[in-house]
Design a protein with these regions (language model features):
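Non-catalytic, C-terminal membrane-associated alpha-helical segments of glycosyltransferases
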Residues: 243-250, 261-326
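Acidic donor-binding segment of Leloir-type glycosyltransferases
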Residues: 30-66
Length: 326
């Protein structure tokens, strides 16, 4: 399926950021975006769900939509509905794209106009850090640590491009939503982001994973390109990251329970891996792997909520379908 067309950058891509009650991050993001090649002629869309409207300098190519509320998936759908370009490039307000980010996106889109979802590389901000790989059933995910004890997650540093048309593990094989380019034609055909998923929603995460599995299930082209690079400036304490990971677990489990019930093999493989890992954690006897009772309760609640959410999504999916993007 031919998704896009060959056209100049400023008519091809809209940059979109979704933010809520993070004025400092949004100001820093806006100041940085102006340094990117081609950003002065590229439409920029800010979906702000803050309690108070953002006060950032205006520009002719900037549109701010202030919609107080919660829900990253809902905000992404607003961006998809409002944008008029064939592609929407999403990044988070704590991400800093490289100078040639737009150029790299445009190059891939011209070479592969059939692509429905395109993921880019996400590196930690700064220079004095160490990368760590967490091995899973489908490869590995990456996080970083600094000497001051802070850590950074939601990274993707693979050096090799990838190209898929059947379901794979999205995080290990493609990337995540903090550096994601979406073809509007694809979501017009197969629907937008599921609003129960993602930050601010009751299932807390996984909206990017779900839409990737859905499009791949339809045979759409999803790609990863390491030259489309940005830096993730989201350093936090290990305790803070652990709390974040509990939320991620809810969304990830919900998505994979849902898709396992739909018969998607990669979802079943993920669930088998997660439950085997959970059994090892609960049964650990040595001090190195033993977890506190507080951790086990929090993770157990996340597992239960994710399972309930996945079954609920499966049931609702039969009747309501997916958000329509016109």
């Amino acid at each position: 399926m031919r998704i896009g067309t060959t056209m100049p950058n400023n008519a091809c891509i809209t940059i979109a950021v979704c933010s809520r009650n993070r004025p400092q991050q949004l100001h820093a993001w806006w100041a940085h975006i102006g340094t990117i090649a081609g950003s002065d002629t590229t439409p920029i869309l800010v979906i702000d769900q803050s309690d108070v409207a953002p006060m950032i300098p205006r520009a002719p190519n900037l549109t701010i939509m202030h919609r107080p509320g919660r829900g990253l998936a809902r905000a992404r759908n607003l961006a998809l509905a409002h944008a008029t370009t064939p592609y929407i490039a999403f990044c988070d307000d704590d991400c800093r794209p490289d100078h040639d980010w737009l150029t790299a996106i445009t190059t891939v889109m011209h070479q592969h106009p059939e692509v429905a979802l395109l993921y880019g590389a996400v590196w930690p901000s700064g220079a004095d850090y160490q990368l760590h790989h967490h091995h899973t059933h489908a490869g590995s995910t990456v996080w970083a640590s600094r000497r001051d004890g802070l850590v950074c997650s939601a990274l993707r540093v693979a050096a090799t491009p990838s190209h898929y048309t059947t379901p794979v593990a999205p995080l290990e094989c493609l990337g995540q939503g903090n550096n994601l380019i979406v073809a509007r034609a694809a979501v017009q055909q197969w629907g937008g982001f599921q609003p129960w998923l993602g930050a601010g929603a009751w299932l807390q995460a996984g909206e990017d994973v779900e839409i990737t599995l859905r499009l791949l299930s339809h045979g759409a082209v999803c790609m990863y390109e390491p030259q489309i690079r940005l830096r993730h400036d989201a350093w936090q304490t290990p305790d803070s990251l652990m709390a974040t990971e509990h939320g991620y677990s809810v969304g990830m489990l919900a998505v994979h329970v849902w898709y396992a019930l739909k018969g998607v093999d990669v979802a079943r493989e993920y669930l088998q891996f997660r439950f085997n890992t959970a059994k090892k954690t609960i049964g650990a006897r040595d001090e190195t792997h033993r977890r506190s009772r507080t951790f086990l309760w929090a993770r157990g609640w996340a597992l239960a909520k994710g399972i309930i959410g996945g079954v609920s999504l499966w049931l609702v999916g039969w009747t309501k379908g997916f958000p329509k993007i016109s």
